[in-house]
């Protein structure tokens, strides 16, 4: 809106200048007409009174035009002052916008620092949870080893009991075969569990690498923030230099070139920052791909855990079947193998407890994995927010640079308009002074001519110091142009003989 007002004022100044030039041309035409009237006055003495009256009338019209030109000049000076005031308001608005932008930028920096602290706290909590999970897995491994030792002892006892019962009970042989099948299935379950633990370790490694990548992204984001603050500081310095350069118009051109070089340097730094942001975005995409891979592996781990649960349920069903068969066998060989069966029942009960404990640990591990996955999703959402904020800061920086360039162009245009208005005002002032001086000279000459004509004095020519011939009427002179000298001389020569007679 201020730019449109300045354009309107510039157009008004141009129109006023054109009107002043037209008034000047009209003044020159009237001056020529006045000279022609004076020539007619010299050619005919009978019409002297009428010509003098017309000369006075032309003089009054000329004085009125001079007064109008003075009024127009004052209006031009008022408009020039209004242009200067608009320029000052533009500078004040520029400073206010810069201060507001600095306050907004500081608030965003504080928000970014707060989010960064929260993110660091969450990462530390996640590391503590991962450490607890590692401890739980270490305990699970120790329990697994103990269970394997107990299982080996149980196998040895079962083999000894089977050797003693092979020759006696066919049903016990079938029980041994079933126990072997049970052991084989237990081994398969143990292998599946080992595979799950290996996959969990691999997930831990990938999670550690992902944490390292997140830390690297945070460092790069911090370096990007430092670069942005440096660019903003240089931009503020540049704005201060632009504001200070308005006070010294004599060194404005050199300062403008230096500022333009500085602007180009800032643009190069901005392009470098953009390339860094692109690299950061590429790394973020790679990290996202790694997270997707980790999610797929977690899904596979869940599937394996589900299979292990199914195997455990099958083992429990087989265990129930074995209990039923043991109860049937107990009725037949209760007197001979009561102690062995009691030991087997105790071992089976212990094995069931261990299976239940393992199921609880597996459920706790799955719960911890889900919680870890949720934490990772939250972290990546925060990283995405940080990247989006960085893009917003970048866009705001570009808008600020564009706004600063626009304000700079408006300032230069206002200075050019002020310079042109000053030049037009000086030119009009010179023309007005010349017209006033010419009017005063003509007024004096007309008054002298009027007085001399009333007294009936002779008319003669003489040459002035400017080289132009002058018409003398008993001491009064009227300066004539070189173009009119010949015609005026001939007219006067024709007029002089009657006077001498």
Swiss-Prot record:
Residues 1-501 are annotated as: Rodlike tail (S2 and LMM domains). Gene3D superfamilies: 6.10.250.2420. It comes from the Eukaryota. It holds the Pfam family Myosin_tail_1. Residues 1-457 form a coiled coil. Residues 492-501 have a biased composition (Polar residues). Residues 182-202, 221-254, 397-501 are annotated as: Disordered. One of its GO terms (molecular function) is ATP binding. InterPro entries: Myosin_tail. Residues 223-233 have a biased composition (Basic and acidic residues). It is found in: Cytoplasm, Myofibril. GO terms for cellular component: bicellular tight junction; myofibril; myosin complex; myosin filament. Keywords: Actin-binding, ATP-binding, Coiled coil, Cytoplasm, Motor protein, Muscle protein, Myosin, Nucleotide-binding, Thick filament. Muscle myosin is a hexameric protein that consists of 2 heavy chain subunits (MHC), 2 alkali light chain subunits (MLC) and 2 regulatory light chain subunits (MLC-2). The rodlike tail sequence is highly repetitive, showing cycles of a 28-residue repeat pattern composed of 4 heptapeptides, characteristic for alpha-helical coiled coils. Muscle contraction. This is Myosin heavy chain, embryonic smooth muscle isoform. It comes from Oryctolagus cuniculus. The lineage of its organism: Eukaryota, Metazoa, Chordata, Craniata, Vertebrata.
């Amino acid at each position: 809106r201020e730019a449109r007002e300045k354009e309107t004022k510039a157009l008004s100044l141009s129109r006023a200048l054109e009107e002043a030039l037209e008034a000047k041309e009209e003044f020159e035409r009237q001056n020529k007409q006045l000279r022609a009237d004076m020539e007619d006055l010299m050619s005919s003495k009978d019409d002297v009174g009428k010509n003098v009256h017309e000369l006075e009338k032309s003089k009054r019209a000329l004085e009125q035009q001079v007064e109008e030109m003075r009024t127009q000049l004052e209006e031009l000076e008022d408009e020039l002052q209004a242009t200067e005031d608009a320029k000052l308001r533009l500078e004040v608005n520029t400073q206010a916008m810069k201060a507001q932008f600095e306050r907004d930028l500081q608030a965003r920096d504080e928000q970014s620092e707060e989010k960064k602290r929260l993110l660091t706290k969450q990462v530390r909590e996640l590391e503590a949870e991962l450490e607890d999970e590692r401890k739980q897995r270490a305990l699970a491994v120790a329990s697994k080893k103990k269970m394997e030792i107990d299982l080996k002892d149980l196998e040895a006892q079962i083999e000894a009991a089977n050797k003693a019962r092979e020759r006696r009970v066919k049903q016990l042989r079938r029980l041994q075969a079933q126990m072997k099948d049970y052991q084989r299935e237990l081994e398969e379950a143990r292998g599946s569990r080992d595979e799950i633990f290996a996959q969990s370790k691999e997930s831990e490694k990938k999670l550690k690498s992902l944490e390292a990548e997140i830390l690297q992204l945070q460092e790069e984001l911090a370096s990007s923030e430092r670069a942005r603050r440096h660019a903003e500081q240089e931009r503020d310095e540049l704005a201060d230099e632009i504001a200070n350069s308005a006070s010294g118009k004599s060194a404005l051109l050199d300062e403008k070139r230096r500022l333009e070089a500085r602007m180009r340097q800032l643009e190069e730094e901005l392009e470098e920052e953009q390339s860094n942001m692109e690299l950061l975005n590429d790394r973020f995409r790679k990290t996202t791909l790694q997270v997707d891979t980790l999610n797929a592996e977690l899904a596979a781990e869940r599937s394996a855990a589900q299979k292990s649960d199914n195997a455990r349920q099958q083992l429990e069903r087989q265990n129930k079947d074995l209990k039923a068969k043991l109860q049937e066998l107990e009725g037949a060989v209760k007197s001979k193998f009561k102690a062995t069966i009691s030991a087997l029942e105790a071992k089976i009960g212990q094995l069931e407890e261990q299976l239940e404990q393992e199921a609880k640990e597996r459920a706790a591990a799955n719960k911890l994995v889900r919680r870890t996955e949720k934490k990772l999703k939250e972290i990546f959402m925060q990283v995405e927010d940080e990247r989006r904020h960085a893009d917003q800061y970048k866009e705001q920086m570009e808008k600020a640079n564009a706004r600063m360039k626009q304000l700079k162009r408006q300032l230069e245009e206002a200075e050019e308009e002020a310079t042109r208005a000053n030049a037009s005002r000086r030119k009009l002032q010179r023309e007005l002074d010349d017209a006033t001086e010419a009017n005063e000279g003509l007024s004096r000459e007309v008054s002298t001519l009027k007085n001399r004509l009333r007294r009936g004095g002779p008319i003669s020519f003489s040459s002035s110091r400017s080289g132009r011939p002058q018409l003398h009427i008993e001491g009064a002179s009227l300066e004539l142009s070189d173009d009119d000298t010949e015609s005026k001389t001939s007219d006067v020569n024709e007029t002089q003989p009657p006077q001498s007679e």
